[in-house]
């Protein structure tokens, strides 16, 4: 089915995108915000010009841009993720930080026409495909209904957590980001991690794979890392909310390093070419 038709049916509760076979699939729900402690990985992502990353909520991409990234290849198995990323990018260019937070993280609590007004303020900076997608929803539904549908994941974080973990939401960075967005080249790929062969030839300063490892075969994932083409001092980061020793035993070579963070079980694995 067409993306727009599927999205309308999901919001209108006439189609279910909840699958017993796979958590993540072509029309799986999108995260409203990252549930990862992105502030912990910030030091590993500074001044990385060329990046490959999962799309997800788009938050890490906005952080990367703040840190100097100019070329971004981004992939997600869900076809909805890229539409949401472009919505956030357009919103940043047109809304104040407080309006942005209200639109994306407070709209879940209330019906209000002001959210429609915010959308029609930002829509001029959407590309045609994203504009057609979001117009098709706002023409028939309130933002409250859209944002509380299964188009989005119910896994939500507090506004306090979101502001703390995302450097792009610091007032100074947010205002700088408004001018930086148009200088960034973003390429979208609707793909899972194992079907990115066309990108193996590209050279990256950083590849961010979030916690994808938790949902795939670990041996297959390990083999995949060596297929990517990293620049000198380039790295691949894998995020863990927690990790057991059996998984760590799969990554004992010297080009794998694990880093822990204070006051959390979260860890990051850094991979570098030998």
Predicted regions: what is each one?
Residues 1-47:
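S-adenosyl-L-methionine
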Residues 2-12, 80-183:
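Class I S-adenosyl-L-methionine-dependent methyltransferase module
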Residues 41-42, 242-274:
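C-terminal region signature
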Residues 48, 196-208:
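A short acidic, Gly/Pro-enriched loop at the edge of an enzyme's catalytic core
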Residues 48-57, 72-75:
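Conserved class I S-adenosyl-L-methionine
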Residues 204-219:
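A short SAM/SAH-binding and catalytic strip from SAM-dependent methyltransferases
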Residues 208, 232-244:
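Conserved beta-strand signature within the Rossmann-like core of class I S-adenosyl-L-methionine
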Residues 220-235:
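A short glycine-rich, Lys/Arg-flanked "PGG" loop and its adjoining helix->strand segment in the class I
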